[in-house]
Amino acid sequence: MDSQAQPPPTFQPELFGKYFLIDRVATGGMAEIFKAKTYSTAGFEKLQVIKRILAHLSDNEDFVSMFIDEAKISVSLQHANLVQIYDFGKIRDNYYIAMELVEGKDVKQILRKLAQKRKLLPEEFAIFIAHEVCKGLDYAHKKTNLQGEPLGIIHRDMSPSNVLVSYSGEVKIADFGIAKAEMSTYNTKDGVLKGKFEYMSPEQARGEDVTQQSDIFSVGIILYEMLTGRRL
């Protein structure tokens, strides 16, 4: 999730199509993130996360195209180490993605809390988290279409805030919002950096073409930060 996102001061629960938005978790520069619930015909409740494009961006064709690409990429990915996408579409004038709710914290939050206590994340935990992240990336990097052709998926924004750790110990990669894949219809403009600069590979920081190895480089920076408590 966007590291700049800040929870707004107030929120009134609202009905959004079949989703009842319980709480607004964060608002970034491009979208709002909500905790929501849905009801089955039998009356069962299911908690989910809704990512909804900000109203003023809904008329931006380039951005909507990028958002739809994110949904197409994410829906095609089914792996234990990736946040699962359930649905995407448009309700009234709002585009949205419905995804798995991971009850837990992201690595950025975990490291910040440890720093406040002047403690380091135990080495075995750091290695476990990095290993699980690499499993998820390996799956995404090797994903093919129905014809067996590589999709060429690259996350491009691997950072502590996009690594979620559930209270039960699951590790999941979030936010393929700026992922690059051959199936994408939206092309990043030349010279425009996508991702968080401090976790970028050298080629990504220079605005050059990125590869799947760029994601792995970013994971190495995350692992360094988890082991040392310091940014590289």
Q: What is the role of each PLM region?
A:
Residues I129-A130:
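Activation segment signature within eukaryotic-like protein kinase domains
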Residues L21-G29, I33:
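Protein kinase glycine-rich loop
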Residues D215:
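Conserved catalytic-loop aspartate of Hanks-type protein kinases
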Residues F88:
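Activation-segment/catalytic-loop signature of the eukaryotic protein kinase fold
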Residues L54-S76:
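AlphaC helix of the eukaryotic protein kinase fold
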Residues R92-D106, I110:
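Conserved short submotifs of the Hanks-type protein kinase catalytic core
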